[in-house]
Amino acid sequence: MAAITPSWALETTADGEVKEKTSGPGGQWRALNVGPDLIRSLLIRKFKTPTPIQRAAIPPALSTPPRDILGMARTGSGKTLAYLIPLLQRTGSTHHGQGPRALILCPSRELAVQIYTVGKDLARGMNKGKGKGKNKNEDEEDEEGKGKEGLRWALIIGGEGMDAQFEKMSSNPDIVIATPGRFLHLIVEMHMDLRHLQTVIYDEADRLFEMGFDVQLQEILHRLPSTRQNLLFSATLPSSVAEFAKAGLVNPLLVRLDAEQKISPDLALKFFSVKPGEKEASLLVLLREVIGKPNQPEPADPSSAPQAIVFVATKHHVDYVAELLRTTGYRTSLIYSSLDQVARQQQLAGFRSHQSDVLVVTDVAARGLDIPIMDHVINYDFPAGPRIFVHRVGRTARAGRKGTAYSLIVKEDFPYLCDLHTFLGTERMGEPADVLRSLPIEQLSENVEYVFHNLDETAPHITALRNVMRKGQGMFERSRTKANPTSYRQAKSLASALSNNPPRIDDMFEDAMEVEVNEEKARLLAKVAAFTPSETVFEVGKRESESAIIMKKRRKTVDERQKRVSKAEAEKSTASGMEKAPVKELPAPQLPSKNFKDPSFYLDHTQRGAEAEKGYSLKSGVESLSGAITDMTADEGTGPKAQKASQLSWDRKKHKFIKKNGSADGEKMIKSESGALLPASYSSGKYQEWKSKRRHMPDGPVEALALGGGRRGRHGPPGQKRKAEDGDGGEDAGGKGRKDQGKSKGTGKGKDDFKQKSPGKPGKKGIKQSSGLKSAMDIRKQREIAQKRKEKNARKPQKFRK
C-alpha cells in the first residue's frame, strides 16, 4: 500500500509557473486528464482551479487500471468534486441501459440529496457541451430523431415511497446515490443485479464503516462485483487501511492532505465556560451578539442576513431549544433523524432560502452539508469525540470564507475539551485554561431571569419540554463514550485552576472599561462561590458561649501545630538532600554543553501522532470490547435447554410460547445470501405487487425495461403450459376449455357478480381468479347494466307522472 502525497498535488498555481499544457482556460483541469466536456461544465460553474485533494485524487482515479483511493482532506476542500469528476469521466454522458454502473453511499439523507443535486448539475453541463464538434454519425442520428439519452440518476433514501423508488431502479439508472439501509431494502426486495457496477464511492467513509452500518454494508458488499473500483473520502480518516478491510480494497492509494491541520485556518474557535443552569441564557446572549436581536425587520437583501447552526445532543434538545428560540422571536428550523423526510426537506430548504435565522440540529447534519454563506456554528452540547467536533465546525469556513465556532462548556465537558486539545494540538487551539472565556454577567443574569421566570409564565409548554430534555440529557450522559483517562486528570486540575482564577470575558462583547468591571465582578463571585466557613453549623450564632470559645482555641492550636509540622518537614527534606548530594551535584557554574542527540534517530516512548490517530480511529472502546467477547457453550445437560428456552417468548395473542427468529426484540428475520440476518420486511413482496399493477398499464420506456421488454404474447416458449389469464381457461385452469367458461353453479341473472367463477369443490382444483383485465364483452355488458340502472333511477315516481 502506498501512503504518499504526490508532490504535484501540493503545487501552487502562481502566475508564471503554469506550463504549456496548463495554459488557457481549463488548462489546469486538462493537466489532470479531465475531458473537454467536463472541463466546460466546470468552467461554467466557476470551478477554474482544482483544489489540492482534487489534484491528488483525480489522476490515480482515472488511471488504467483504476486504483482504489482513500482520500482525506479537511472540510470544505472540494472532496465531492474529487470523486464526481472521475466518476463522470468514466461513465460518460449517455445512458447505456445495462443497470447501475456507479454507486455512491452516504450516511445521511441530506448529504445524499446534496450530492445528487451537484452531480446532476455537473452532468447537465456535459450534455450541453455535446452540441459542438459532432461527427457525421451523430448528425445523422439527430436528423433521424435518435439522439442519445443523458445519464440517468437515482436518489434512493429512506422516508420516501417505495413505489417511486421501484420505478427509478426499474429504469436501469446509471448512477445511484443512496443511504445503506434503504438501498439494501431495494436490493433484497427486487433481487437486483449489480454485476455491471464499476465504481463504488463511500462518502464520509469513517461514519459508514462504524458499527451502526455494519450489517447493511456487509450485505451490500457481498453482492458487488470484485472488479469494482473503490473510492473512500472523508475529513477524518485513519491512516490504517485495515479498518476498511471490509471494503475489499486492492492496492489502495492513501492521500491524506492537511493531516496536521485538521480544521480550516480561516476558522476561529471560541470556548465559553458556563454553568448547566445558564446554557439557555448563554445561547440567547451568543445569538444576540452573532445574529442580532430577535424580531428585527428583514433586510433588503435576505441572503446577506447572518445565520447560525446550533448543534445539540438529542432530538429532545432539538424540540426544546427550537421552541425556546421561536418563543424568543427567532425564526427557527429544526432537523433530527426521526423527523419525517418531507419535513426535513422543507426545514432545510427554508433555512437555505433565508426564511429562518437558526437551524437546530443533531449530528445528523454534522457531515457533508454545504450551506452557503454560513459564518457561525454553536455547539450547545459539546461533542464526545474530536471527529464529531471537526465535522460540526466544518459547516463554516468553507471554500476560503471565514467563520467562527462557539462552544458552551460545562464542568462535565472538561475531559472532552482536553481530548480535543490533544487531537488538535497546542499550536492550533492553545491550552484549555487559556482558551476558555466567560460571558458578561449582567446579560447572563437578565436572560436567566427571562428564561426561567418570564417565559414559564407566558409559555408554560416550555417547562414540559424542559423536563423531557433533562431526562434525555441524563440518558445521553450515561450512554456517551468516555474520554481518555489522562484527560480526566487534566480536567481536575483545570477545574481547580478556574475556581481560583475565573476565565475572563471575551473581547467580542464590550469595550475595555466595561470588561474590567465585569472581570472584577466575576472574581468576586468566584471567591464567594469558593468560600468555606471555618465554623461548623453547630457554632453559628453561639460565638460567646463557652463551647464556642473552647472550639475556637482548639482550632487555633491545631492550625499552629500543622504549620510547625509542615515547616519542619520541608526543612528536613532540604537538609537531607544537601547532605546526601555529592560534590559534583552541588551548585556550580554552568558551562555551555553540546547536545549530541540526533532528533532524526531518537525514539520517543510513544509514536509520533499516535493521539491524533486515536482520534481518527473508527473503533471506540465499546466496539473493541465487543470484539474480545467469546460465547462459551455450557458443559452440562441443563445448558442447551436453558439456551433453547431463552429463544422462546410468550405471545399474548396466541397464548403460547413462540420462537424468536433471530432478533433480540422478537422481530422476524430472514437469512440473506451472505448469511446475514435481515428484517423480514425487506422481503415483503411489495415489488411483486407493484410489478403486477404495472404490467397492465400502457407500455412505456420504464415499463418495458422493468418487465423485460413489455408483456409477452399469447404463445409462450415451446413446452411451457399456458396460464389461465384474462378470463381465458388455459391448461392450468380449473375448467376443461373455453366452452366451460361461465357454467359454474351459483350464478343468477339478478346478481351483479354472475361472471365470478366458483372456487370449486374441496379436493379438486378450483378455477383461478381473474387477473383483473376485462375482455371487450365484459366491458360492454357492464356498461349496459350501468346504463339501465341510470335510466331506472332517472324515472319520476308514479304519483308525479301525468
From Swiss-Prot:
One GO BP annotation of this record: rRNA processing
SUPFAM superfamilies per UniProt: P-loop containing nucleoside triphosphate hydrolases
Signal peptide: none
Basic residues composition-biased segments: 789-802
GO cellular component, one term: nucleolus
Motif (DEAD box): 203-206
EC category: hydrolase
Short motif Q motif, span: 27-55
Family annotation (InterPro entries): DBP10_C, DEAD/DEAH_box_helicase_dom, DEAD_box_RNA_helicase, Helicase_ATP-bd, Helicase_C-like, P-loop_NTPase
Family according to the record: Belongs to the DEAD box helicase family. DDX54/DBP10 subfamily.
Stated name of the protein: ATP-dependent RNA helicase DBP10
Lineage: Eukaryota, Fungi, Dikarya, Basidiomycota, Agaricomycotina
